[in-house]
C-alpha cells in the first residue's frame, strides 16, 4: 500500500496564552479512513515542533504522497511546505477550507486538491493513483491535465456519519496538547463533532460554502467516542460543531446518554441565541456542559439583519441570561466595522456587549473569506494580497488586521475593541455600583474620543 504523510501546518508562539490549540480533527478522520482501508499513514503536526524537527519527521517518514491541510491562517505556511517537499516522485495533495474555496490557486504548488469532505474522496484518489488510473472519474477533486485546470463534479455529502471511523487520535501528540492546557487552564480539552453542516446563511460565514446539509451522528456513537477520549486521560471535550444546539431533541438525547453511562466529563460548545431555553440549558449543565459560546456578533438589530444572523439583540440578551441561570459559563463573539456600520452602531455593540453578564467576550474585525457573501461585497476594497492574510503571530484581541477599506481606520476599530474590553472588565470586577462611579465616566469619555477619531 502507498505511504502517505499528512501535515498540519499550524504555527504560533507557544508562549502566547491567547491561542487555543486543538489537534487536527479533520486530518484525524482522513487518517482513520485511510488506515481502515490498509494504507500506511503518518501525521506530522507542526503545533509543538519547530520547522526543522517537523521537516525531519516528514522526510524520515519517506512518503510517496503528502497531504497538507490549509485554512485561512495557514495559507502561507502550507504553500511554503509544498515548495519544500516538492519532488518528482512525491504527489502533493491539498485539502481543507481554503483549497476547497480556491482550488485553482493551490494547484500552482500542489498536484491535486481535495474539495469538501475528504474521507471517501481520498480513498478513491489513492486507489486510482496506486493503480495508475485516470483521475477524471473521481468526484470532489481538482487537478491539472496538460496545464489545464480540471475541476471534477462535487462529491455527495456523507449522509451517515456513524459509518465513519473515529479520528485516529493515536496519531495526535496528545501529551503535548494535554500539558499545554493543564499548565494554563488546569484542565485538558480536545475536540469532537456531533454533526456536520449548518442550515443558516450568515453573511460572513464560510459554512454555507461547504453546504447547508445538516447531518448528525447518533447519540450513542458520539458518547462512544467520548468514552474513548476519556481513556486518553482528557477531562474535557470541545464540541466543534458550527452550532451544537441546532436540534433540541438530538442535544437532549446526547445529554441523556452521557448521564445514562455516568460519564465524568466536562464539555463546551458553540450555540445560537435562538436555540437555547431554560430546560435545554439545565439539561446541558446536568450532563457536564460547563461553558457555552454564542455568536452574537452585533448589538444593533440593523447590523444583525445585514449579517443575515436571523436573531435580535433581545434574543441574545435572553440567551445569555438563560445560560447563566442554569449555571453555565458564557462567552460571546462580536464583530465590529461591518459594511453598513456607523459610529453609532459600533458604539451600540460595544456598550451592549459590556453590559451582558458574560464570563468571556471576544471582538474581531470582519474577515472576508473567499466564497462568502461578505467577500463578494468588499472584494474590490481589499488591501492585502491573500498570501498576507495571516494574523500576527501574537493573536491578542488588539492585533487583528483590517483587510479592506471599511470606512473606518484600523486604529479606530482597535480603539473600540479596547474600549469594549475595558468597560467589560470594569463592570465584571467592580459590579454595577463600581461601574456607575468609574465605568460610566470612562464610557462617556471614550464614546466622545471614538466619534472624533478618523
Q: Locations of the language-model features?
A:
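Catalytic cores of alpha/beta
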Residues: 104-108, 280, 340-354
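Radical SAM [4Fe-4S] cluster-binding motif and immediate context
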Residues: 22, 167-333, 351
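Glycine-rich beta-alpha loop elements in corrinoid/cobalamin-binding modules
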Residues: 2, 20, 26, 30-160, ...
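Short, solvent-exposed turn/loop segments enriched in Gly/Ser/Thr/Pro and often Arg
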Residues: 47, 98, 240-247, 272-273, ...
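C-terminal accessory regions of radical SAM enzymes
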Residues: 2-14, 142-145, 149, 329, ...
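N-terminal [4Fe-4S]-dependent radical SAM core
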Residues: 10-12, 138, 144-194
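Active-site charged/polar residues at nucleotide-handling catalytic sites that mediate phosphoryl
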Residues: 61, 232, 356
